Amino acid sequence: MRYVGVDGCKAGWFAVMLRGDGDREVEVFADVSSLWKKHSSAAAILIDIPIGLREGGHEERKCDREARRVLGPPRASSVFPAPCRPAIHAGSYREASDINKRMTGRGLSLQTWSIARKICEVDELLLSERAARLRVREIHPEICFRAFAGHSMRHSKKRAEGRLERTRVLESIYSGTPGVPEDARSAYRCREVATDDILDALVAAVTAMVGREGLGSIPETAEFDSRGLRMEMVYCGRDIGPAH
């Protein structure tokens, strides 16, 4: 069986595919539809992108609120509010922020706007491909790392010590960890795929593979949006509780 972890990158989508027999593959896809076309028969595709969006209203997705509570400072800040669905179809940041403000009472951060197109891609895929809803599920890398390590990461993933911290967590779970960045670097430049993109996609793939018998989720009972998409973040490892 194939287990796929995916993270957005400057070149599109960076995917790590792992097999139970030890085989692995890394690849960049220009769009999520191409990724789905290749990996639609995978056991699971775990992706770092909001799935399931509110149409409006002042209440945030429960998974976002609970993920921040679980991570605690400073990692809680890595979980930003998901936009409402109408905002992701806007033609500009100003328009998107105005729509989000009108529909939810909150403006839109530039960070969220920078991935709006990717959120839209995944939303459209899941709304048009019912089979994808069974396999494509949302993760947040920091939740996955916390679940494996038993604590939130202490250092930023943008710093060398943070990348080392996360690599060590992955190595404790998956012996093939060192080979994945090597494979990625032999095929893609840093300006196409950043090192933290590689680690985030890898922790998603490892989560899918190790959690093949079942994954935990935040919240424990998933919410569904108005279109029937789950609003949750899945993980594998220790039971997740509030940050200490």
Label the model's feature ranges:
Residues M1-Y3, G8-H244:
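RNase H-like (RuvC/DEDD) metal-dependent nuclease/polynucleotide-processing core
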